[in-house]
From Swiss-Prot:
<dbReference type="InterPro" id="IPR029063">
    <property type="entry name" value="SAM-dependent_MTases_sf"/>
</dbReference>
<keyword id="KW-0963">Cytoplasm</keyword>
<dbReference type="GO" id="GO:0008990">
    <property type="term" value="F:rRNA (guanine-N2-)-methyltransferase activity"/>
</dbReference>
<keyword id="KW-0808">Transferase</keyword>
<keyword id="KW-0698">rRNA processing</keyword>
<comment type="function">
    <text>Specifically methylates the guanosine in position 1516 of 16S rRNA.</text>
</comment>
<dbReference type="Pfam" id="PF04445">
    <property type="entry name" value="SAM_MT"/>
</dbReference>
<keyword id="KW-0489">Methyltransferase</keyword>
<keyword id="KW-0949">S-adenosyl-L-methionine</keyword>
<feature type="binding site">
    <location>
        <position position="178"/>
    </location>
    <ligand>
        <name>S-adenosyl-L-methionine</name>
    </ligand>
</feature>
<feature type="binding site">
    <location>
        <begin position="123"/>
        <end position="124"/>
    </location>
    <ligand>
        <name>S-adenosyl-L-methionine</name>
    </ligand>
</feature>
<comment type="similarity">
    <text>Belongs to the methyltransferase superfamily. RsmJ family.</text>
</comment>
<dbReference type="InterPro" id="IPR007536">
    <property type="entry name" value="16SrRNA_methylTrfase_J"/>
</dbReference>
<dbReference type="GO" id="GO:0005737">
    <property type="term" value="C:cytoplasm"/>
</dbReference>
<protein>
    <recommendedName>
        <fullName>Ribosomal RNA small subunit methyltransferase J</fullName>
        <ecNumber>2.1.1.242</ecNumber>
    </recommendedName>
</protein>
<feature type="binding site">
    <location>
        <begin position="107"/>
        <end position="108"/>
    </location>
    <ligand>
        <name>S-adenosyl-L-methionine</name>
    </ligand>
</feature>
<feature type="region of interest" description="Disordered">
    <location>
        <begin position="228"/>
        <end position="247"/>
    </location>
</feature>
Length: 255
């Protein structure tokens, strides 16, 4: 059954074939073949983006590792400046393998890959995964980012199921979780993205179960991103915490 909330729109006739292939892959209608939908995937010369269609809707969101905030940040990433690096246990001579079990738009995975980690990105919502795949493909063509992007490996599927099915041999050193929660960040970008995301996926109601699956699999630690003043996920006390202004990282040492 197709998702009646989303349709696909293409900007020019030369993109029609690609749009039709994407529609078939995601089981979504093209915009002209359905009634108005709350969300629309837009395929144009800049890549793939996702937008709400309401009259008061913010602009579209797109995964862009090359320019904008992520491109600026990538040039300035360092071990000392990244609390995430400390949370996952990156050291001068050590780069753990990481599974980002809630990949979303790939920002935290990109930071970890920029610091030298091999990162498996798990995203269960196929539309978000399509946005991420498009961003990775475009970034891989940038000479300055090619090595970083090569360390990012996207898997579309449910994180809990994927973790439960792992064999003993390829267990990751670290599993990272950033469950969907109401952000306190009031920036226009965060508000725009959260509005689109909540329309599409809502909150991560199964985050406690995913945490349990992660704790059973991670060789070294599980890291959970939380609002600074929130209770630990599932009330489970972490081994230690890395605090920040609006968020913190709860670290669960497993080995």
């Amino acid at each position: 059954m197709s998702d009646t909330r989303i349709s696909i729109r293409y900007a020019s006739e030369d993109l029609r074939e690609r749009a039709e292939a994407l529609a078939a892959e995601l089981n979504l209608p093209l915009a002209g073949e359905s009634a108005g939908t709350p969300l629309v995937l837009i395929l144009d010369g800049h890549g793939l983006s996702l937008a709400l269609t309401a009259p008061d809707a913010p602009g579209p969101i797109q995964v862009d590792f090359v320019t904008g905030r992520l491109g600026y940040r990538q040039a300035r990433i360092s071990l000392r400046s990244e609390p995430l690096a400390r949370a996952v246990g990156i050291k001068d001579s050590e780069r753990p393998s990481v599974v980002d079990a809630t990949a979303g738009l790939g920002r935290d995975g990109f930071v970890l890959a920029s610091l030298g980690c091999e990162v498996t990105l798990l995203e269960r919502e196929p539309v978000i995964a399509a946005l991420l795949a498009d961003g990775l493909e475009r970034a891989a063509r940038d000479a300055d980012l090619a090595q970083t992007i090569a360390r990012m490996h996207l898997v579309t599927g449910n994180a809990r199921d994927w973790l439960t099915a792992l064999d003993e041999a390829p267990r990751p050193d670290v599993i990272y979780l950033d469950p969907m929660y109401p952000h306190r960040d009031k920036s226009a970008l965060v508000k725009k993205e959260m509005r689109v995301f909540r329309t599409l996926v809502g909150d991560d109601q199964d985050a406690p179960e995913t945490l349990e699956a992660a704790l059973a699999v991670a060789k070294r630690r599980v890291v959970v991103k939380r609002p600074a003043r929130a209770e630990p996920l599932s009330g489970r006390k972490p081994s230690h915490q890395i605090p920040g202004k609006t968020t913190r990282f709860d670290v669960y040492v497993t080995g």
